[in-house]
Amino acid sequence: MVKKEKKANVSGKPKHSLDANRADGKKKTTETRSKSTVNRLKMYKTRPKRNAGGKILSNEYQSKELPNSRIAPDRRWFGNTRVVNQKELEYFREELQTKMSSNYNVILKERKLPMSLLTDNKKQSRVHLLDMEPFQDAFGRKTKRKRPKLVASDYEALVKKAAESQDAFEEKNGAGPSGEGGEEEDGFRDLVRHTMFEKGQSKRIWGELYKVIDSSDVIVQVIDARDPQGTRCHHLEKTLKEHHKHKHMILLLNKCDLVPAWATKGWLRVLSKEYPTLAFHASVNKSFGKGSLLSVLRQFARLKSDKQAISVGFVGYPNVGKSSVINTLRTKNVCKVAPIPGETKVWQYITLTKRIFLIDCPGVVYQSRDTETDIVLKGVVRVTNLEDASEHIGEVLRRVKKEHLQRAYKIKDWEDDHDFLLQLCKSSGKLLKGGEPDLMTGAKMILHDWQRGRIPFFVPPPKLDNVASESEVIVPGIDKEAIADNSQAAAALKAIAGIMSTQQQKDVPVQRDFYDEKDLKDDKKAKESTETDAENGTDAEEDEDAVSEDGVESDSDADEDAVSENDEEDESDSAE
């Protein structure tokens, strides 16, 4: 038989569905299909292409061959990966507790350690009475209990037990820095406070803080050098120790130019026993401690070598200078700053280098037993919002030396705070109609000068009993045997220890004509409290004198060289 030949399609209407020249069936016109229509039709076709034998030639969405799902018969799949006996585990647990008692030590390769076996679980507060004494032993025929178990045998023992419990509760949930070494309470507290004295305690602000903590690898707590213990957040430190042990904390003594050099060095020695502490003066042009802080952050980046970049969060009280520190590190104004609290509203990311990012956080205040006057003098409340600013002036006169107030306001003598305000208003011309002194404006002037550092004031450091050796300054928490290794992490720890020790020997800048010679050179009581840790080979007067401007300029020049590469690497200096 002869096969019939197919007629050639000579009508000019191609029938293939993927032919771009085919006419659209919906329309009765002779228009051809567009390219987008042909691509859409090709997208609908997902069936595999097969040859005459049924073998798949090409398929876009399915694999051509099934992988071999058979598991190799290896005992490593079913055996123990790591085995340790109880003696080694107990020895390692003791060593871990010893090393981690210091905030200067770091756990390397924490993910490879059985932390659930090394950390002891907290004791359960609930008493399992049924496990200790079941019902059968307490009631029924098989009763074994002869007399009930009581907490105390008589009323005196019960009162003693209650007093011990109360003391333990107050010690655990105390006010923190305000209650330590301060005045004893009179048993009264403010039942109702104005909402302005609760600034920095809102749920939104605490949410911003915890976002910064969760996002940060290193947390820098900025504190005021004039009152370091008063501006510390012990609640935050306790939270980090309990729930964020893998995060590192640094204490930064900002505004060190407002206190004498001997006071700054004394606080460095005191606070360094708890956390790595650095002195800092925030200034874009003339800064102090910028090179040391950058070096410490670089060493922490070396410790976190498994991460592509690390984040450094700056937290602390309002108006302590967190945003100013970030601007100093970047050598440009990338964060909004103001001499009033509450300028930073939300957290923001700042790029320092390719491996280091900075996070600015709003100021957070932990609720404590501070009075309204303490809250105002810590810089938490804006002075312009105070209804009666004159009631806080008495505490300012008690804290500041009389000669400093005489030099600042040109007032020779006064009887009380009201008399001081009267003389200040008359001398400065703050008068109302009829020549009456404007006490409110005068009080706000004093509080503005207090918050902006124009009135000399500082809390002296406590006395230390430990005396350092002549050859070197001891940095607490650093084990020389542990850092003797030449590995990268050990070198980073050794570098951090060196930075801490060298800054304790540096001269700290102090504003000229701010303190008199007696305050700069220190009286005998302050010398006894701080010179016990000073080196025997150095002269006390040279250590305690204010540094010259040349020393500050040289430090700032070195800091500019240290971050010169950052400006070239990071073109985008705005916050994300």
Swiss-Prot record:
This is Nuclear/nucleolar GTPase 2. Residues 16-34, 509-530 have a biased composition (Basic and acidic residues). In contrast to other GTP-binding proteins, this family is characterized by a circular permutation of the GTPase motifs described by a G4-G1-G3 pattern. The DARXP motif is also sometime designated as G6 region. It comes from Arabidopsis thaliana. Keywords: GTP-binding, Hydrolase, Nucleotide-binding, Nucleus. GTP binds at residues 254-257, 319-324, 363. Residues 283-285 are annotated as: G5. GO terms for biological process: ribosome biogenesis. GTPase involved in pre-60S ribosomal subunit maturation. One of its GO terms (molecular function) is mRNA binding. Residues 316-323 are annotated as: G1. Residues 360-363 are annotated as: G3.
